[in-house]
């Protein structure tokens, strides 16, 4: 199909069906941070999964999890800042309130598959941040390529299908379960809390 020549196809295996249905739509943008943010024009530096650990261990690097709060509950990288956002489009508000390009010289960002980080790093560069990095292929590519024994990832990775979460080997996780009441992924610890009410 014209325009899809450079499409990066990703395959993920599961023991059964993980989607009730599939729908394909053409949209002007997949992730929205405003019309002026175009990662095709300006984007942060891609960091291969094998090089990610060295980057995030640099004490000058501010590591930001760009995912929504319910995704972060399932797992994240050691030392990552959780901006506690409800929607990705709220990330700029967090950055404007907590980060400063003159103080925070190096920023590394990550998300599930890398799409949100392309947008967020483009936006960060437009705000004057000079060194902005993001994990190429996102968390899922990191889990696929970096052995668990060398991993800086803790917990599961929330995914947007019936699996809810996958472990470091990309197998469906028993730790994170979907709560139909709040619509979030709940860890075992959250489900064992005294205030937890099923449903």
Residue ranges of model-derived segments:
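Rhodanese-like catalytic fold shared by cysteine-dependent sulfurtransferases
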Residues: 1-45, 58, 68-107, 115-199
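Phosphate-interacting basic helix/loop segments used at nucleotide- and nucleic-acid interfaces
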Residues: 45-55
């Amino acid at each position: 199909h014209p325009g899809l020549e450079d499409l990066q196809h990703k395959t993920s295996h599961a023991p059964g069906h993980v989607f009730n249905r599939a729908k394909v739509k053409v949209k002007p943008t997949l992730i929205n941070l405003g019309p002026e943010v175009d990662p095709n024009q300006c984007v942060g530096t891609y960091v291969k999964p094998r090089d990610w650990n060295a980057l995030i261990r640099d004490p000058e690097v501010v590591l930001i999890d760009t995912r929504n709060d319910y995704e972060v509950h399932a797992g994240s990288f050691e030392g990552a800042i959780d901006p506690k956002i409800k929607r990705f489009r709220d990330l700029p508000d967090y950055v404007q309130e907590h980060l400063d390009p003159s103080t925070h010289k190096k920023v590394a960002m990550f998300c599930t598959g890398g799409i949100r980080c392309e947008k967020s790093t483009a936006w960060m560069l437009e705000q004057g941040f000079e060194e902005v990095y993001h994990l190429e292929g996102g968390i899922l590519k990191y889990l696929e390529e970096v052995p668990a024994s060398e991993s800086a990832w803790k917990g599961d990775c929330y995914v947007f299908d019936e699996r809810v979460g996958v472990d470091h080997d990309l197998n469906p996780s028993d730790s994170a379960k979907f709560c139909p009441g709040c619509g979030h992924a709940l860890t075992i610890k959250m489900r064992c809390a005294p205030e937890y009410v099923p449903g």
